[in-house]
Amino acid sequence: MKKYSILGIIILAVILGGGVFALFSALSGGPWEGVWWGVQEAGMNWSGDNIRNLETITFTRNDDKTITVDHRVQQGSKEVEGSLSGTGAIDGGRLIVTTKTGREVTFSYSRISKLIELPLKNADKTPVTVKPLTEENNNDMEEIRSEIVKISQKPENKIDTTLSSTKS
């Protein structure tokens, strides 16, 4: 009888522990809030530079339980609005976002790696991932931003938009 009592207590503890974990996960808001960042490795350009795009995503919870997604991309010396900006709804570990252009895209969260996988691809066809922006990794993000700007300002990477004219 004692064996069954101990086994019952263990099973009850496991069930309660799982319930508490699920409740905590639901109440903590999950990954869909705050600022997240990552780097898209876009490949080599014609001058041999490794081209990278700094991706920053800000998730904001709305009163109607939707999530506003603000996607920004550091492309060269300019930060532009990204193609993933829009409004999303949580679906389990995923966020289904309707972008401003009306396209539906999916963001996936991995509880193991603690990263969000974006519907963007690196040059090697692997998915682009982002991590939460913290005080500890903010300097890393800003260093990458500086490298991207510096590479874009190299003379061989400038795009000449002037038209040449020849005199006959």
Regions found by a protein language model. Give the residues of each.
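Acidic, glycine-rich flexible loop segments
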Residues: T98-S113
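Tryptophan-anchored aromatic micro-motifs
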Residues: S28-N53
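Glycine-centered tight beta-turn/hairpin loop motif at sheet-sheet or coil-to-beta transitions
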Residues: N50-R52, S77, K100-E104, K121-K125
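Edge beta-strand at a domain terminus
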Residues: E81-R94, S113-L115, P119-S168
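N-terminal Sec-pathway targeting helices
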Residues: M1-L16
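Short beta-strand segments that buttress and anchor functional surface loops
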Residues: W36-E41, V69-V73, R94-K100, L118-L120
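Membrane-interface motif at the C-terminal end of an N-terminal transmembrane signal
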Residues: G18-P31
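N-terminal glycine/threonine-rich, aromatic-flanked beta-hairpin/loop signature
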Residues: S47-G92
